[in-house]
Structure formats: structure tokens, C-alpha cells
């Protein structure tokens, strides 16, 4: 007999909890199915010395033939009438138990989210097994590509037409590690928290302090969640009254094209930075190298971010903020996870994106994002790669 079990995937973009969410624009994806065929086999005698029972053993007269599942699919219990066959390890020992992957404190990065269109665009969640996500939004484009891991852990967010003003917006890219929870939480909450804190602030120091409160509030809220795991690097760009406010915690980076010259607006937070290493050691932590990479407590390769409860004493959520007045020669802004920057330099990224952003009648922002992502992948990046491009002259 044969049995087909339809496994419904969650939508690529699910509703956001943000105040600006527009549920009408949620996208959905087609179903995928897992097909299993069970055929009866005549019991065969086996050697008494064999301690285990295989799929074709006398104790198991049914042979399971599994067709290759969809990419990223994790098998769960499959029901056959009143009985069930589990892909883990049923009591009869039909299938061999596998030791679960250990994810206590993540090493390395992985690191994605997409916005819902309306007068305000807000982050939503893609399927974890989604291979690629792209979006051409109102005044920005973004492209994200999954690395070699089973789940996409990068997220992004964008709110345009903020407070009904087309010259106000906030964008973000989030690179998760140790799971998607922290990046997803940040993408749904950080921009909202920043906007709430910044309202009414005029002085640059007040704005920078307000952004810091937004980051810290997001981190504190995430750590109160149940089953908190992993963390996320963050980079955000707030456009307010002609000012560009760029903040980061971790190694997501913001780079601006100024007349074709790359200008970094953020500095990566890694244990290899002298000031970061000194801060960590002063508070009782230690930094060492593992396979040539500087890590905190021999584990994490970034020194700031949202989450990372086990290392919270040293992995702080406080961002560094840089505020610039948008000028005419400020052409576009690149926000990207380290999946890009580990393989592509700041100037090279600007040189590749600029002809597509400025050299055509209609800017080909999405094509530029894809070109940068593909270049990093072609150079051997195994990480998730997320690139967002934002033309800046629209805000002058």
C-alpha cells in the first residue's frame, strides 16, 4: 500500500507583531509533500549474533522506502490510521536513533526577514527552509540567500513612509546565530522600539541615546522570552529630517557610496578589536583564537548583539551610532550581513552596485543586490548572505 502525507509549509511571510503591520499583504507558498511506500516483505532469518533490528529484519516485516524529502524538511511523526511511524526512534527500534545536534553556545554565524508592503513596510518571517528571498520595496531592495545550513537565519526589516512622511524611514539587517529566534525577534521589534524612543529628539546626542535605549529594550524583552536561544547581530539605518542615523551591534555593516567612494558608517564588533577585547577582559571574560578566529570564552566570534544569554555579561547589546546629514553626493547605502563583507571589500561592493544604481534610467537595485550576493557565494562563502540597497537622494 502507499500513503502520501501532505506537509503544509508556513507562509514565506507571516504576520508581524509590529504596530505597522498590514495583514492583507501576507504571501503564501505552495505545499510540499512527503510520499512513503510500505511494502510487505516475507520475514527472513537473521544471525542470532545481530544485536539490532533493521528495517528488513524479522521483527519488522515492513520495508520503508523514503523518497527524498524537500530541501530543509525535518521529518516528524507520520500517522497511518490509528498507528504512527516516527522518523526519530520508535519503541520497536525500526529506525536508528540519531544524537541531536548540540547548540549550546553557537560558534560562527549564520545568519534573514522581509517587509510587508503598505504605507509602512514591516518585517515578517520567511520559511526557515527558504533558499532565497528577494523584495523590491518602496525606495529600497533586498536579496537574501541561504548558506550551507538547513535554515536561513538572516532577517531584515523596513518601514517606509514613516509617520506618513515619505522622507522618513527605518531599515535593518539582522544576522542570527544559534537559531533564528533572536534575529526574528529583532526584526519584528527593534525598528519599532527605536522609532518610539527617537520621537521628539532633536540633538544628535539625544538621538544616539534614544537609539541605544531602543537596542537595550529589544535585548531585554528578548531575554524574557521562553526558551531563549542564540543571538543576533544588528545594523539599522534611520532616516529622519534629512539625517541618516546608522547604528550597529555585531558585525553587520553599513557602507555608503559618496560620489563613488565607499565610506563605512559602522565598525564591526569582534573580539579581535583592541577596545572590545579590553572591555571583555575587564569584566572577567577571556578572548582566544580557535581555528584562527578570535572568540569570547572560546565560543562566539562577535562581541555585541541581541540575545546570547549565556554570554550576556560580555556580549552587550549597546550599539555604536553614527549620524550624518544626507548630502547630494551621498548616493546609496548598503546594509549587509557579514556573509557579504567576509568576501567582498567595501569599495568593491560600491564599484559593483553603483553602475546598476545610478547608470540606468530606472535603478536596478535588486539586480545589484543579487550581483553582490552571487559574488560572495562564488568566492566560497558558506554563510547566509543578505544585502539591502537604499538610494539616499530620495530623502533630501
From Swiss-Prot:
Protein phosphatase that negatively regulates defense respones. Inactivates MPK4 and MPK6 MAP kinases involved in stress and defense signaling. Mn(2+) 2 binds at residues 175, 338, 383. Its EC number is 3.1.3.16. This is Probable protein phosphatase 2C 25. Disruption phenotype: High jasmonate production and PDF1.2 expression upon wounding. Slight reduction of lesion size caused by fungal pathogen. Slight decrease of spider mite reproductive performance. The keyword Hydrolase applies. Binds 2 magnesium or manganese ions per subunit. The keyword Transport does not apply.
Amino acid at each position: 500500500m502507499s500513503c502520501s502525507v501532505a506537509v503544509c509549509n508556513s507562509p514565506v511571510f507571516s504576520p508581524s507583531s509590529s504596530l505597522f503591520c498590514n495583514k492583507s499583504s501576507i504571501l503564501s507558498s505552495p505545499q510540499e509533500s512527503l510520499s512513503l511506500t510500505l511494502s510487505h516483505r516475507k520475514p527472513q532469518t537473521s544471525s542470532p549474533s545481530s544485536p539490532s533490528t533493521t528495517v528488513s529484519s524479522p521483527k519488522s516485516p515492513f520495508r520503508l522506502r523514503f523518497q527524498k524529502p524537500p530541501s530543509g524538511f525535518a521529518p516528524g511523526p507520520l500517522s497511518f490510521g490509528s498507528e504512527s511511524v516516527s522518523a526519530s526512534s520508535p519503541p520497536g527500534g525500526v529506525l536508528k536513533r540519531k544524537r541531536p545536534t548540540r547548540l549550546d553556545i553557537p560558534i560562527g554565524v549564520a545568519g534573514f526577514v522581509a517587509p510587508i508592503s503598505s504605507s509602512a513596510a514591516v518585517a515578517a518571517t520567511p520559511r526557515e527552509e527558504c533558499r532565497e528571498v528577494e523584495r523590491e520595496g518602496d525606495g529600497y531592495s533586498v536579496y537574501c540567500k541561504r548558506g550551507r545550513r538547513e535554515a536561513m537565519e538572516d532577517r531584515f526589516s523596513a518601514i517606509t513612509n514613516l509617520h506618513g512622511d515619505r522622507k522618513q524611514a527605518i531599515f535593518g539587517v539582522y544576522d542570527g546565530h544559534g537559531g533564528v529566534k533572536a534575529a526574528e525577534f529583532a526584526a519584528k521589534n527593534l525598528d519599532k522600539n527605536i522609532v518610539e524612543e527617537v520621537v521628539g529628539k532633536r540633538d544628535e546626542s539625544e538621538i544616539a541615546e534614544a537609539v541605544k535605549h531602543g537596542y537595550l529594550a529589544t535585548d531585554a524583552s528578548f531575554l524574557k522570552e521562553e526558551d531563549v536561544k542564540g543571538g543576533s547581530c544588528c545594523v539599522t539605518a534611520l532616516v529622519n529630517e534629512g539625517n541618516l542615523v546608522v547604528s550597529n551591534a555585531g558585525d553587520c555593516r553599513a557602507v555608503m557610496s559618496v560620489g563613488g567612494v565607499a565610506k563605512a558608517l559602522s565598525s564591526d564588533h569582534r573580539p579581535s578589536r583592541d577596545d572590545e577585547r579590553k572591555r571583555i577582559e575587564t569584566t572577567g571574560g577571556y578572548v582566544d583564537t580557535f581555528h584562527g578566529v578570535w572568540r569570547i570564552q572560546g565560543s562566539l566570534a562577535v562581541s555585541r548583539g541581541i540575545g546570547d544569554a549565556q554570554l550576556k555579561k560580555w556580549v552587550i547589546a549597546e550599539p555604536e551610532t553614527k549620524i550624518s546629514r544626507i548630502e547630494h553626493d551621498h548616493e546609496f547605502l548598503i546594509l549587509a550581513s557579514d556573509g557579504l563583507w567576509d568576501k567582498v571589500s567595501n569599495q568593491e561592493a560600491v564599484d559593483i552596485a553603483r553602475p546598476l544604481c545610478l547608470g540606468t534610467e530606472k535603478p536596478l537595485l535588486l539586480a545589484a543586490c543579487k550581483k553582490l550576493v552571487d559574488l560572495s557565494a562564488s568566492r566560497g562563502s558558506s554563510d547566509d548572505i543578505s544585502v539591502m540597497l537604499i538610494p539616499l537622494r530620495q530623502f533630501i
